[in-house]
Amino acid sequence: MIFEHCNYLGDLELNKKETKGIRLYNLPNGDWVPSITSVTSFYNRQIFADWRKRVGVEEANRITKKATTRGTDFHAATELYMLNKEINWDDFRPLTKFMFHHAKPYLDKINNVHAIERTLYSEYLGLAGRVDCIAEYEGELAVIDFKTSEKIKPEKWLENYFVQEMFYASAYYELTGISVKKLITIMVTPGGEVKVFDKRNKDDYIKLLVRYIKEFVHHNTGSEDGE
């Protein structure tokens, strides 16, 4: 499949740095703002800490490293495909090729790509981050997130994914004036199972995003109202 591309972001890119474990992006106005992943990770920090305690530090590190490698490889292959570039499968593990093969019918529902692995920011929200994809999915413009997981997770566990996608939708609108219709998460497992989560209740997730931001700001500045 050949994907059509349209670029409304120009050559936008931002410098970034790490400070006290928080990734910061330098906006065009000179402000340094946190990444959306720093905010969502902070909001879910206790869940992650409880999991590490339950399975043990060594096992948690092993699982995290394995998941990170799997996700990075799958994203790299998907990005090449979406950019209409040839994938040299000798550069990837067999598992990546297997997972990509099962995800491909769902990837082929994407077209008219606005962004693939692009940095977005919002001065209004004071955040920035890197979106997997903004494109039409089954004919409707969407923020599209590619996720790998050992098994398909229940939707109730994925709130932070949808909140992060909502930020990208908000930032893209702020930067371009273009509104996305929906939030799409394509999740694929090492066993080849694929699940697509399609969220359209954007108002709910913008409210959650504000809550995430306020808690993050309160923790890092001591401000009661997150301002």
Residue ranges and their predicted role:
Residues 1-128, 227:
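Metal-dependent nuclease catalytic cores that hydrolyze phosphodiester bonds in DNA/RNA
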Residues 115-222:
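Mg2+/Mn2+-dependent nuclease catalytic core
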